[in-house]
Amino acid sequence: MNSQFKLIGFDLDGTLVNSLPDLALSVNSALAEFELPQAPEELVLTWIGNGADILIGRALDWAKEQSGKSLTDEQTAQLKERFSFYYAENLCNVSRLYPNVKETLETLKEQGFILAVVTNKPTRHVQPVLKAFAIDHLFSETLGGQSLPAIKPHPAPLYYLCGKFGLYPHQILFVGDSRNDILAAHSAGCTAVGLTYGYNYNMPIADSHPDWIFEDFADLLKIV
């Protein structure tokens, strides 16, 4: 390995895994229990990226606009619990790895890079997803939404990786599909790759000014 980078970090949803179908199904299953309207998948896409609480908050705001119905705090907490239940039961029913993800991760691991996952996804769901696609063994660290006091776009997860592995920020390359990924990386002093195929609230990743922009996950091999 002859690279300035020693560790490569990855977002999960929209970067490694296309989890939108299962997330949308779980959101709508929870909404249905409270007789709220069903959201189209392309709309749920714009709600992803800031963790489960904000995802459900956006869903409820939309449902209120559509139906005029609002939930009490207790009902909102119950709906969040139901979403978590449905998603735990449907983590990988329809979700798939994006093209070239597994092969590229294996190559990077063989080349000696430390690999890590940094996601805002609920921590308890992260390992089951990685295991379902048989890539969990490739990562030396996995950080979810409850692993640390702060989540992306805060740089704390990347600072944590620096401390754990004894690295400087410039030795970390972070790969993601949303502005939160790019903001977190740049705030920490890390280099950022933006992927065009992910979610990012339906906005071009170029608007967030990553250091590189790729359409294919395998293109990472060109810069390391």
Curated annotation (Swiss-Prot):
Metabolic or biological pathway, per its Swiss-Prot or TrEMBL entry: Organic acid metabolism; glycolate biosynthesis; glycolate from 2-phosphoglycolate: step 1/1
Entry EC number(s): 3.1.3.18
Uppermost EC category: hydrolase
Domain of life where this protein originates: Bacteria
Keywords carried by this UniProt record: Carbohydrate metabolism, Hydrolase, Magnesium, Metal-binding
Active site: 11 (nucleophile)
Catalysed reactions, as listed in the record: 2-phosphoglycolate + H2O = glycolate + phosphate
Cofactor(s) of this protein: Mg(2+)
Disulfide bond positions: none
Coiled coil feature spans: none
Gene Ontology annotations for the cellular component aspect, listed alphabetically: cytosol
InterPro entries for the chain: HAD-like_hydrolase_sf, HAD-like_sf, HAD-SF_hydro_IA, HAD_2, HAD_sf, PGP-like_dom2, PGPase_prok
Transmembrane segments: none
Binding site for Mg(2+): 11, 13, 177
UniProt xrefs under CDD domains: HAD_PGPase
GO BP, one annotated term: carbohydrate metabolic process
Single GO MF annotation: phosphoglycolate phosphatase activity
NCBIfam families: HAD-SF-IA-v1, HAD-SF-IA-v3, PGP_bact, PRK13222.1-2
PANTHER family referenced in this protein's UniProt entry, alphabetically: PHOSPHOGLYCOLATE PHOSPHATASE
Protein family (similarity comment): Belongs to the HAD-like hydrolase superfamily. CbbY/CbbZ/Gph/YieH family.
Role summary: Specifically catalyzes the dephosphorylation of 2-phosphoglycolate. Is involved in the dissimilation of the intracellular 2-phosphoglycolate formed during the DNA repair of 3'-phosphoglycolate ends, a major class of DNA lesions induced by oxidative stress.
Protein name: Phosphoglycolate phosphatase
Organism: Mannheimia succiniciproducens (strain KCTC 0769BP / MBEL55E)
Biological classification of the source: Bacteria, Pseudomonadati, Pseudomonadota, Gammaproteobacteria, Pasteurellales
